[in-house]
Regions:
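Conserved catalytic cysteine-centered active-site region
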Residues: 63-119, 149, 160-166, 243-268, ...
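Conserved active-site "lid/cap" helical segment
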Residues: 2-78, 82, 86-89, 97, ...
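Condensing-enzyme catalytic core mediating Claisen C-C bond formation in acyl metabolism
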Residues: 2-34, 44, 175-176, 244-310, ...
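Active-site-proximal alpha-helical scaffold in enzymes
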Residues: 94-125, 174-203, 275-282, 347-348, ...
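Active-site pocket-lining segment
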Residues: 168-171, 204-207, 214, 296-365
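N-terminal extracellular/periplasmic Venus flytrap/periplasmic-binding protein-like
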Residues: 19-20, 31-32, 39, 183-286, ...
Protein backbone atom coordinates (compact mmCIF):
# COMPACT_ATOMS: atom_id res chain seq x y z
CA UNK A 1 0.00 0.00 0.00
CA UNK A 2 1.33 3.45 -0.91
CA UNK A 3 2.12 5.90 1.89
CA UNK A 4 0.81 9.44 2.32
CA UNK A 5 -2.40 11.18 3.33
CA UNK A 6 -5.70 9.92 1.93
CA UNK A 7 -9.17 11.24 2.66
CA UNK A 8 -12.51 10.17 1.28
CA UNK A 9 -15.54 12.45 1.33
CA UNK A 10 -19.04 11.00 1.54
CA UNK A 11 -21.16 13.91 0.37
CA UNK A 12 -19.14 16.94 -0.75
CA UNK A 13 -19.93 18.73 -4.01
CA UNK A 14 -18.52 21.61 -6.04
CA UNK A 15 -20.54 24.46 -7.55
CA UNK A 16 -19.96 27.67 -9.48
CA UNK A 17 -16.39 27.00 -10.56
CA UNK A 18 -14.98 29.92 -12.51
CA UNK A 19 -11.76 31.73 -13.30
CA UNK A 20 -10.42 34.89 -14.83
CA UNK A 21 -8.58 34.67 -18.14
CA UNK A 22 -5.02 33.38 -17.85
CA UNK A 23 -2.97 36.31 -19.13
CA UNK A 24 0.76 36.33 -19.84
CA UNK A 25 2.79 38.09 -17.19
CA UNK A 26 3.50 41.77 -17.81
CA UNK A 27 0.27 41.74 -19.81
CA UNK A 28 -3.23 43.16 -19.44
CA UNK A 29 -3.70 41.94 -15.84
CA UNK A 30 -0.16 42.63 -14.68
CA UNK A 31 -1.00 45.78 -12.72
CA UNK A 32 -3.87 44.19 -10.78
CA UNK A 33 -3.23 42.77 -7.32
CA UNK A 34 -3.99 39.08 -6.72
CA UNK A 35 -6.46 40.16 -4.05
CA UNK A 36 -8.58 42.03 -6.57
CA UNK A 37 -8.35 39.18 -9.08
CA UNK A 38 -9.43 36.84 -6.29
CA UNK A 39 -12.37 39.05 -5.35
CA UNK A 40 -13.48 39.13 -8.97
CA UNK A 41 -13.44 35.34 -9.25
CA UNK A 42 -15.05 34.85 -5.83
CA UNK A 43 -18.01 37.10 -6.54
CA UNK A 44 -18.69 35.38 -9.84
CA UNK A 45 -18.35 31.90 -8.32
CA UNK A 46 -20.94 32.63 -5.64
CA UNK A 47 -23.27 34.00 -8.31
CA UNK A 48 -22.86 30.96 -10.58
CA UNK A 49 -23.49 28.67 -7.62
CA UNK A 50 -26.91 30.28 -7.20
CA UNK A 51 -25.96 31.61 -3.79
CA UNK A 52 -25.20 34.91 -2.06
CA UNK A 53 -22.26 35.87 0.12
CA UNK A 54 -24.33 35.40 3.27
CA UNK A 55 -24.62 31.68 2.44
CA UNK A 56 -20.86 31.10 2.81
CA UNK A 57 -19.67 29.59 6.09
CA UNK A 58 -15.91 29.41 5.50
CA UNK A 59 -13.37 31.12 3.26
CA UNK A 60 -10.28 29.19 2.15
CA UNK A 61 -7.87 31.09 -0.06
CA UNK A 62 -4.38 30.67 -1.43
CA UNK A 63 -1.72 32.99 -2.87
CA UNK A 64 1.97 32.23 -3.16
CA UNK A 65 4.11 35.28 -3.89
CA UNK A 66 3.03 38.57 -2.29
CA UNK A 67 1.61 40.81 -5.00
CA UNK A 68 0.73 43.71 -2.71
CA UNK A 69 1.45 44.97 0.79
CA UNK A 70 -1.89 43.72 2.12
CA UNK A 71 -1.27 40.09 1.16
CA UNK A 72 -1.44 38.99 4.80
CA UNK A 73 -5.14 39.86 4.68
CA UNK A 74 -5.72 38.20 1.31
CA UNK A 75 -8.28 35.54 2.39
CA UNK A 76 -10.07 37.98 4.66
CA UNK A 77 -10.35 40.70 2.04
CA UNK A 78 -11.50 38.24 -0.62
CA UNK A 79 -14.31 37.11 1.66
CA UNK A 80 -15.40 40.57 2.81
CA UNK A 81 -15.52 42.05 -0.69
CA UNK A 82 -17.31 38.96 -2.01
CA UNK A 83 -20.12 39.68 0.43
CA UNK A 84 -19.28 36.98 2.97
CA UNK A 85 -20.48 37.95 6.49
CA UNK A 86 -17.87 39.55 8.71
CA UNK A 87 -18.33 36.78 11.30
CA UNK A 88 -17.18 34.07 8.88
CA UNK A 89 -13.52 33.05 9.35
CA UNK A 90 -10.99 32.99 6.53
CA UNK A 91 -7.81 30.94 6.15
CA UNK A 92 -4.71 31.31 3.98
CA UNK A 93 -3.55 27.96 2.60
CA UNK A 94 -0.17 27.21 1.01
CA UNK A 95 1.09 24.04 -0.63
CA UNK A 96 3.00 25.80 -3.41
CA UNK A 97 1.72 24.51 -6.79
CA UNK A 98 -0.68 22.19 -4.95
CA UNK A 99 -2.39 25.03 -3.11
CA UNK A 100 -5.59 25.03 -5.18
CA UNK A 101 -6.06 21.28 -4.67
CA UNK A 102 -5.38 21.70 -0.96
CA UNK A 103 -8.26 24.18 -0.79
CA UNK A 104 -10.64 21.43 -1.93
CA UNK A 105 -9.14 18.96 0.55
CA UNK A 106 -9.53 21.36 3.46
CA UNK A 107 -13.05 22.33 2.43
CA UNK A 108 -14.06 18.67 2.27
CA UNK A 109 -12.52 18.11 5.68
CA UNK A 110 -14.37 21.06 7.23
CA UNK A 111 -17.68 19.92 5.76
CA UNK A 112 -17.20 16.26 6.79
CA UNK A 113 -16.34 17.38 10.35
CA UNK A 114 -19.52 19.44 10.52
CA UNK A 115 -17.69 22.74 10.90
CA UNK A 116 -19.60 24.29 8.00
CA UNK A 117 -21.96 23.33 5.19
CA UNK A 118 -20.48 25.76 2.67
CA UNK A 119 -17.02 27.02 1.76
CA UNK A 120 -15.67 29.52 -0.74
CA UNK A 121 -12.35 28.51 -2.34
CA UNK A 122 -10.16 31.10 -4.07
CA UNK A 123 -6.68 30.85 -5.54
CA UNK A 124 -5.02 33.89 -7.09
CA UNK A 125 -1.57 34.71 -8.42
CA UNK A 126 0.14 37.65 -10.05
CA UNK A 127 3.42 36.44 -11.51
CA UNK A 128 3.98 39.97 -12.80
CA UNK A 129 3.84 41.46 -9.31
CA UNK A 130 6.32 39.02 -7.74
CA UNK A 131 8.57 41.39 -5.80
CA UNK A 132 12.24 42.20 -6.09
CA UNK A 133 13.22 41.45 -2.51
CA UNK A 134 16.02 41.52 0.06
CA UNK A 135 15.92 39.71 3.38
CA UNK A 136 18.98 41.18 5.08
CA UNK A 137 18.42 44.91 4.59
CA UNK A 138 17.18 45.78 8.11
CA UNK A 139 20.64 45.32 9.58
CA UNK A 140 22.13 47.61 6.94
CA UNK A 141 24.57 47.18 4.06
CA UNK A 142 28.32 47.43 4.36
CA UNK A 143 30.03 50.16 2.38
CA UNK A 144 30.85 48.88 -1.09
CA UNK A 145 29.20 45.50 -0.54
CA UNK A 146 26.72 44.11 -3.04
CA UNK A 147 23.11 44.89 -2.19
CA UNK A 148 21.17 41.64 -1.96
CA UNK A 149 18.01 42.45 -3.90
CA UNK A 150 16.87 39.50 -5.99
CA UNK A 151 13.95 38.53 -8.22
CA UNK A 152 11.54 36.63 -5.97
CA UNK A 153 9.97 34.78 -8.90
CA UNK A 154 13.28 33.45 -10.18
CA UNK A 155 14.83 32.71 -6.80
CA UNK A 156 11.72 30.84 -5.64
CA UNK A 157 12.35 28.28 -8.40
CA UNK A 158 15.52 27.21 -6.60
CA UNK A 159 15.35 24.37 -4.07
CA UNK A 160 18.24 24.89 -1.67
CA UNK A 161 18.01 21.33 -0.25
CA UNK A 162 19.23 19.50 -3.39
CA UNK A 163 20.79 22.72 -4.72
CA UNK A 164 18.93 22.71 -8.04
CA UNK A 165 16.09 24.58 -9.72
CA UNK A 166 12.72 23.28 -10.89
CA UNK A 167 13.82 22.88 -14.50
CA UNK A 168 16.70 20.68 -13.36
CA UNK A 169 14.26 18.42 -11.52
CA UNK A 170 12.49 17.88 -14.85
CA UNK A 171 15.82 17.16 -16.53
CA UNK A 172 16.47 14.52 -13.87
CA UNK A 173 13.16 12.88 -14.76
CA UNK A 174 13.94 13.05 -18.48
CA UNK A 175 17.13 11.09 -17.85
CA UNK A 176 15.46 8.62 -15.48
CA UNK A 177 12.62 7.82 -17.90
CA UNK A 178 14.55 8.18 -21.16
CA UNK A 179 12.50 11.12 -22.42
CA UNK A 180 13.92 12.91 -25.47
CA UNK A 181 13.74 16.56 -26.50
CA UNK A 182 11.61 15.49 -29.47
CA UNK A 183 9.07 13.80 -27.19
CA UNK A 184 8.82 16.87 -24.98
CA UNK A 185 8.38 19.23 -27.93
CA UNK A 186 5.73 16.94 -29.43
CA UNK A 187 3.87 16.90 -26.12
CA UNK A 188 4.05 20.70 -25.89
CA UNK A 189 2.86 21.14 -29.46
CA UNK A 190 -0.12 18.91 -28.70
CA UNK A 191 -0.92 20.90 -25.56
CA UNK A 192 -0.99 24.11 -27.58
CA UNK A 193 -3.15 22.56 -30.30
CA UNK A 194 -5.69 21.22 -27.79
CA UNK A 195 -5.88 24.56 -25.99
CA UNK A 196 -6.43 26.44 -29.24
CA UNK A 197 -9.20 24.00 -30.19
CA UNK A 198 -10.84 24.36 -26.76
CA UNK A 199 -10.60 28.12 -27.09
CA UNK A 200 -12.02 28.20 -30.62
CA UNK A 201 -14.91 25.88 -29.70
CA UNK A 202 -15.94 28.14 -26.83
CA UNK A 203 -15.31 25.48 -24.18
CA UNK A 204 -12.78 27.55 -22.25
CA UNK A 205 -14.97 30.65 -22.42
CA UNK A 206 -17.56 28.77 -20.38
CA UNK A 207 -15.36 28.87 -17.28
CA UNK A 208 -14.07 32.43 -17.70
CA UNK A 209 -15.45 35.58 -16.14
CA UNK A 210 -14.18 38.59 -18.12
CA UNK A 211 -12.17 41.13 -16.15
CA UNK A 212 -13.54 44.66 -16.50
CA UNK A 213 -12.98 47.98 -14.77
CA UNK A 214 -15.18 47.87 -11.68
CA UNK A 215 -15.42 48.76 -8.01
CA UNK A 216 -15.79 46.27 -5.15
CA UNK A 217 -17.53 47.51 -2.02
CA UNK A 218 -17.90 46.07 1.47
CA UNK A 219 -20.24 47.92 3.81
CA UNK A 220 -18.30 50.08 6.25
CA UNK A 221 -14.91 49.57 4.59
CA UNK A 222 -12.81 51.26 1.92
CA UNK A 223 -13.81 50.39 -1.63
CA UNK A 224 -11.41 48.45 -3.87
CA UNK A 225 -11.32 48.50 -7.64
CA UNK A 226 -9.96 47.08 -10.86
CA UNK A 227 -9.03 49.61 -13.52
CA UNK A 228 -7.95 48.28 -16.89
CA UNK A 229 -5.25 50.29 -18.59
CA UNK A 230 -5.33 52.10 -21.90
CA UNK A 231 -8.35 51.58 -24.13
CA UNK A 232 -9.18 48.10 -22.83
CA UNK A 233 -12.80 47.63 -21.76
CA UNK A 234 -12.51 43.94 -20.84
CA UNK A 235 -10.09 41.02 -20.78
CA UNK A 236 -12.00 37.87 -21.64
CA UNK A 237 -9.58 35.47 -23.36
CA UNK A 238 -6.54 33.42 -22.37
CA UNK A 239 -3.54 35.04 -24.02
CA UNK A 240 -0.93 32.28 -24.26
CA UNK A 241 -2.49 29.56 -26.49
CA UNK A 242 -1.18 29.60 -30.06
CA UNK A 243 -0.48 26.90 -32.61
CA UNK A 244 3.12 25.86 -32.02
CA UNK A 245 4.42 23.30 -34.53
CA UNK A 246 7.12 20.92 -33.37
CA UNK A 247 9.51 22.44 -35.92
CA UNK A 248 9.14 25.86 -34.29
CA UNK A 249 9.55 24.53 -30.76
CA UNK A 250 12.64 22.58 -31.84
CA UNK A 251 14.43 25.84 -32.65
CA UNK A 252 14.27 27.08 -29.05
CA UNK A 253 17.39 26.81 -26.92
CA UNK A 254 17.31 24.45 -23.95
CA UNK A 255 17.43 26.12 -20.53
CA UNK A 256 20.33 23.86 -19.55
CA UNK A 257 22.88 22.78 -22.14
CA UNK A 258 22.04 19.36 -23.50
CA UNK A 259 18.69 19.37 -21.74
CA UNK A 260 15.15 18.88 -23.00
CA UNK A 261 13.33 21.79 -21.34
CA UNK A 262 12.87 25.14 -23.08
CA UNK A 263 10.69 28.18 -22.63
CA UNK A 264 8.33 26.66 -25.18
CA UNK A 265 7.74 23.29 -23.53
CA UNK A 266 7.48 24.50 -19.93
CA UNK A 267 4.48 26.05 -18.19
CA UNK A 268 3.70 29.65 -19.09
CA UNK A 269 3.92 32.49 -16.56
CA UNK A 270 0.46 34.03 -16.22
CA UNK A 271 -1.64 36.20 -13.93
CA UNK A 272 -5.06 34.83 -12.92
CA UNK A 273 -7.50 33.82 -10.20
CA UNK A 274 -9.93 30.92 -9.89
CA UNK A 275 -12.75 30.22 -7.44
CA UNK A 276 -15.26 27.52 -6.56
CA UNK A 277 -17.95 26.98 -3.94
CA UNK A 278 -17.90 23.64 -2.10
CA UNK A 279 -20.89 22.47 -0.06
CA UNK A 280 -22.40 19.50 1.67
CA UNK A 281 -24.35 17.55 -0.93
CA UNK A 282 -27.56 17.67 1.08
CA UNK A 283 -27.29 21.46 1.29
CA UNK A 284 -27.12 21.73 -2.50
CA UNK A 285 -29.88 19.19 -3.10
CA UNK A 286 -32.33 20.82 -0.69
CA UNK A 287 -31.90 24.16 -2.46
CA UNK A 288 -31.80 22.84 -6.00
CA UNK A 289 -28.34 24.30 -6.63
CA UNK A 290 -26.43 23.46 -9.84
CA UNK A 291 -23.83 20.86 -8.79
CA UNK A 292 -20.78 20.51 -11.04
CA UNK A 293 -19.35 17.31 -9.53
CA UNK A 294 -18.81 15.41 -6.32
CA UNK A 295 -15.42 15.73 -4.62
CA UNK A 296 -14.85 12.08 -3.77
CA UNK A 297 -11.33 11.86 -2.33
CA UNK A 298 -7.95 13.55 -1.94
CA UNK A 299 -4.38 12.34 -1.52
CA UNK A 300 -1.05 13.97 -0.67
CA UNK A 301 2.38 12.31 -0.80
CA UNK A 302 6.05 13.15 -0.48
CA UNK A 303 8.76 12.36 -3.07
CA UNK A 304 12.49 13.16 -3.34
CA UNK A 305 12.98 16.91 -3.97
CA UNK A 306 15.37 16.29 -6.86
CA UNK A 307 12.56 14.57 -8.81
CA UNK A 308 9.69 16.57 -7.33
CA UNK A 309 7.81 16.47 -10.65
CA UNK A 310 7.00 12.77 -10.29
CA UNK A 311 4.71 13.62 -7.35
CA UNK A 312 1.39 13.15 -9.19
CA UNK A 313 2.21 9.50 -9.93
CA UNK A 314 2.29 8.21 -6.33
CA UNK A 315 -0.50 10.62 -5.34
CA UNK A 316 -2.74 9.21 -8.09
CA UNK A 317 -1.67 5.65 -7.28
CA UNK A 318 -2.63 6.15 -3.62
CA UNK A 319 -5.94 7.70 -4.66
CA UNK A 320 -6.77 4.66 -6.80
CA UNK A 321 -5.61 2.07 -4.27
CA UNK A 322 -7.64 3.50 -1.41
CA UNK A 323 -10.75 4.30 -3.46
CA UNK A 324 -10.91 0.85 -5.05
CA UNK A 325 -10.73 2.17 -8.60
CA UNK A 326 -8.41 1.17 -11.45
CA UNK A 327 -6.50 3.46 -13.78
CA UNK A 328 -8.86 2.42 -16.58
CA UNK A 329 -11.88 3.64 -14.59
CA UNK A 330 -10.67 7.23 -14.83
CA UNK A 331 -11.89 8.82 -18.05
CA UNK A 332 -10.10 12.15 -17.75
CA UNK A 333 -6.93 13.38 -16.07
CA UNK A 334 -5.91 16.98 -15.52
CA UNK A 335 -2.26 16.93 -14.47
CA UNK A 336 -0.45 20.23 -14.23
CA UNK A 337 2.15 20.62 -16.95
CA UNK A 338 4.83 22.26 -14.85
CA UNK A 339 7.34 21.02 -17.42
CA UNK A 340 6.80 18.79 -20.42
CA UNK A 341 9.31 16.14 -19.35
CA UNK A 342 7.83 16.10 -15.86
CA UNK A 343 4.30 15.41 -17.12
CA UNK A 344 5.51 12.74 -19.54
CA UNK A 345 7.44 11.06 -16.71
CA UNK A 346 4.24 10.89 -14.64
CA UNK A 347 2.34 9.38 -17.58
CA UNK A 348 5.10 6.80 -18.17
CA UNK A 349 5.28 5.89 -14.49
CA UNK A 350 1.52 5.32 -14.34
CA UNK A 351 1.16 3.77 -17.81
CA UNK A 352 -1.34 6.50 -18.64
CA UNK A 353 -2.63 6.95 -22.19
CA UNK A 354 -2.05 10.53 -23.32
CA UNK A 355 -5.45 10.67 -25.00
CA UNK A 356 -7.07 10.89 -21.55
CA UNK A 357 -4.70 13.58 -20.31
CA UNK A 358 -5.31 17.33 -20.44
CA UNK A 359 -7.70 17.00 -23.36
CA UNK A 360 -8.30 20.76 -23.49
CA UNK A 361 -4.64 21.71 -23.24
CA UNK A 362 -2.50 22.18 -20.17
CA UNK A 363 -0.26 24.65 -18.42
CA UNK A 364 2.32 24.67 -21.22
CA UNK A 365 -0.31 26.26 -23.45
CA UNK A 366 -2.54 27.99 -20.91
CA UNK A 367 -0.24 28.88 -18.03
CA UNK A 368 0.40 27.98 -14.40
CA UNK A 369 -0.78 30.67 -11.96
CA UNK A 370 0.57 28.77 -8.92
CA UNK A 371 -2.09 29.01 -6.17
CA UNK A 372 -4.91 29.27 -8.72
CA UNK A 373 -3.86 26.25 -10.76
CA UNK A 374 -5.46 23.52 -8.65
CA UNK A 375 -8.82 25.26 -8.66
CA UNK A 376 -8.57 25.93 -12.40
CA UNK A 377 -7.67 22.33 -13.24
CA UNK A 378 -10.42 20.85 -11.08
CA UNK A 379 -13.07 23.20 -12.49
CA UNK A 380 -11.95 22.41 -16.05
CA UNK A 381 -12.05 18.69 -15.22
CA UNK A 382 -15.59 18.88 -13.83
CA UNK A 383 -16.77 20.71 -16.94
CA UNK A 384 -15.04 18.22 -19.24
CA UNK A 385 -16.67 15.26 -17.45
CA UNK A 386 -20.03 16.94 -17.90
CA UNK A 387 -19.40 17.64 -21.58
CA UNK A 388 -18.15 14.15 -22.37
CA UNK A 389 -20.66 12.33 -20.18
CA UNK A 390 -17.85 10.53 -18.33
CA UNK A 391 -18.01 9.60 -14.65
CA UNK A 392 -14.60 9.74 -12.97
CA UNK A 393 -11.78 12.26 -13.24
CA UNK A 394 -8.55 13.04 -11.41
CA UNK A 395 -6.80 16.39 -11.14
CA UNK A 396 -3.25 16.50 -9.84
CA UNK A 397 0.03 18.42 -9.62
CA UNK A 398 3.59 18.11 -8.50
CA UNK A 399 4.72 20.37 -5.68
CA UNK A 400 8.09 22.08 -5.33
CA UNK A 401 10.22 20.59 -2.57
CA UNK A 402 9.00 17.10 -3.43
CA UNK A 403 5.29 16.42 -3.03
CA UNK A 404 2.31 15.30 -5.08
CA UNK A 405 -1.38 16.01 -4.58
CA UNK A 406 -4.46 14.64 -6.33
CA UNK A 407 -8.25 14.91 -6.24
CA UNK A 408 -10.82 12.36 -7.39
CA UNK A 409 -14.09 13.85 -8.61
CA UNK A 410 -17.28 12.24 -9.90
CA UNK A 411 -19.79 13.45 -12.46
CA UNK A 412 -23.01 12.51 -10.65
CA UNK A 413 -25.03 12.63 -13.86
CA UNK A 414 -22.93 9.78 -15.24
CA UNK A 415 -23.01 7.69 -12.05
Amino acid sequence: MSSGFFQTFRDVVMLGGVRTPLVDYCGALGHISPTDLGIKAARESIKRAGMIGADIGSVLAGNMAPGDFDQFMFPRHVGLYAGVPVQVPALMTQRICGTGFELFRQAGEQIELGLTQTALLVGAESMTRNPIAAFDHRTGFKLGAAVGFKDFMWEALQDSAPGINMIQTAENLAKKYGISRQEVDAFASSSFAKAVAAQDSGFLAGEITPVISETFEAAGYNARSIRLQGKLTEVARDSHPRLSPIEVLAKLRAVHEGGVQTGGNSSALVDAAAACVVTCGSYARERGLPVMARVAAASVVGVPPEIMGIGPAPAIRLLLERSGLQLGDIARFEINEAQGAQTLAVAKELGLDLDRLNVNGGAIALGHPLAATGVRLTVTLARELERSGKRWGISSACVGGGQGIALLIENLRAA
